[in-house]
Amino acid sequence: MKVYCCEPHSYCSGVVKAFLLAKKAKRENPGKDVYLLGSLVHNEEAIKELQKEGFFLLDERKSDLFSSLKQIPDGSVLLFSAHGHPKSFDELAKTKNLIVYDATCEKVKKNLEAIAYFLHAGREVIFLGEKGHQEAAASVSIGEKVHFMDGKRINEFPYEEIKDKAPAFLCQTTMGDEEVRLASKSLQEKIPGVYIIDSRCESTKKRQFALRLAPKEADVIVILGSISSNNTMKLLSIAKESHPEARIFRVLDLEELKKKDLRPYSYCLLSSGASTSPRVYQECLSYLESL
């Protein structure tokens, strides 16, 4: 099979830094339990590897993270995820004398700082994101004047709640380009003075752009990544828009890929979310090229 590789692929720099910090936490605290508050990155395969190394996962899908944080023994080692977290988590960790390592992505940090800046300047903030995502929760928690816009329900946003004639608009770092465009257009129509910032990370933008520009003659698209990964699922949505004639598969790893019947296809586009490891990417690429 002919394979076209969409660049960039595999881990983004934020994910690499998160894993390096996790290893540092283990190395600097021998014999101590290290707790991951929520998935360090949104990829089950990567989290399983960390659990094999002795990390304890406090899963946001199974229990409220603030409640989970309360249950961690005082003096333990805590690793915050790459997706950001509310300030109240820092305060609780301090009262419990936890040894904290913060893997929050630098781009997410900058966005959180920008939101705080606008609030301090007396502005209201509209934040576009995925409901239930850790980054969205962290962003909205900064202040009461941060208004959440659900990426799946942009048209249902309560504009009447915005009193500021020049609010700031930011978005989750992993949102889709079309969602940002639609939200921006709607906001400009309703609130002409809105200050729009496309706060997606560069890795997200480049992956989405590369997929949109990929050869249209491809008859199958394989997107590597977890169903829990927002940036992966945005690639899936974009693939459906940009290549409507192609068959599209979203798989986590080689094991899942081998279960797909790829015999009818001859030209594949291969893309990946930012939490897919280089090893998984290379395994899948080699397999596709062997068909």
Predicted regions: what they are:
Residues 1-291:
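The feature marks the mature, well-folded catalytic cores of soluble enzymes
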